[in-house]
Amino acid sequence: MLGDVLQRRLVFVTGKGGVGKTAVTLALATAAARARRRVLVVEVNPHGRVGEYLGGVTLGPEPTEVAPGLSVAAIEPTVILEEFALRILRIRALARRLLQSQTFRIVAAAAPGIDDFLTLVRIGGWEDARTGLQRRRHRFDLVLVDAPATGHSVPLLATPGSLLKMLPFGPLAGTARELALLLSDPERTAVAVVTRAEEMAVNETLELSAAIMRVGVPLLPTIVNAVAPLRFSRAELRRLLKEPPDVPASLRPLAAAGAFSAARQRAAEREIRRLGRALATTPVSLPLVATRRFTPTAIDELADAIEHAGARRRRAAGVA
C-alpha cells in the first residue's frame, strides 16, 4: 500500500468525518519520509488537526519542515487569492488594489468553485512549479493532501472539469486543463479513501469511491482504519456466539463480554470483505491505535503499521 503511494507525486486522502483521515495522512507521510522521500503534507481544512497531531506545530501558507524529509503547509484563501491576482496583473501593488476592490470581492464570492480552483492551483504548484501560481524553491517527491471530508472532496476534485465547461477558452482554461491532466494521470495522482469496518462507513465509502471514479481521478486501495485486533479463532468465535454460552454459569458475564467482542470482530470482517468485493480490490487494514489523543508517538505507531502492511502485500504478491 505504501508502495502505491510512493509511486505517485500527489495523493489526496479523504473519507467520512471521524474515520481518522488526518492521522492516516500523517502516518503515510511519516512512512514515506522514512523511505527517503521529500514529503509535503497540505492541510485544506482551516479547522484541521495536522498541527495538533504533530505536537502543536503552527502551519502557514509556505512549507515548514517538522521532521527530516517531512514538511507541512496550510491552504490560506487570502494568500492564494493574492497570488492569483498577481499572476494576472504581474504588479503586486495593482494586485493588492484589485483585492481591496468591493466589486472584485463580490465577483470572487459569487464565482462558483473559485476557492477550490485556487486551492488546486496552489497544490499543483507544489507537485510541479509549472502548474502553480508562482515558481517555488520548494521541491517535493510526494505531496499528501489532507483533503476535505466526503461531502466536499468530490466537488474539489471536479473543479477543473466544471470550470472548463463554463470557460473553455482563456488563461484560466489553460490552467484548468493542466490541472485536469494532473488529476487524471494515474502515474502522478491518486486518491486514498479512509474508512472504518462499519456498515454506515462502508456504504458511504462505496458511494464516495464511485463518485471519484466518475470524476476520473485514480483510486488507491481503500484504507480501513482502526481495525480492532483479532482476539478469537474461528472455533472460539463459534463457541462464544453459541446460545446459551458453553461455559459455567459463574463465567457467563465474562462470556457475554467476549461474545460482544466476537460479534464486533465478525461484523468487521464481513464489512471488509463486502468492501473488497464491491471495489474489486483488497482493502488495507490498519490497527486500532490505543490512544486518547493523537501525538507524534501515535503517528509513528500507525506509520509502523503501514510499513508492515506494505511488507505483507509484497509477500502475498511474491515480491521481495
Task: Give, region by region, the residue ranges found by the protein language model.
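N-terminal phosphate/diphosphate-binding loop that engages ATP/GTP or pyrophosphate donors
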Residues: 29-100
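Phosphate-binding P-loop
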Residues: 2-8
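Flexible beta-alpha connector loops of hexameric P-loop NTPases
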Residues: 78-82, 106-114, 163-171
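The Walker A (P-loop) glycine that initiates the GxxxxGKT/S ATP-binding motif of P-loop NTPases
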Residues: 15
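Conserved catalytic-core segment of NTP-binding enzymes
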Residues: 3, 19, 23-27, 34-35, ...
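ATP-hydrolysis module of ASCE/P-loop NTPase motor domains
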Residues: 86-131
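NTP-binding/hydrolysis catalytic cores, primarily Walker-type P-loop NTPases
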Residues: 278, 282-320
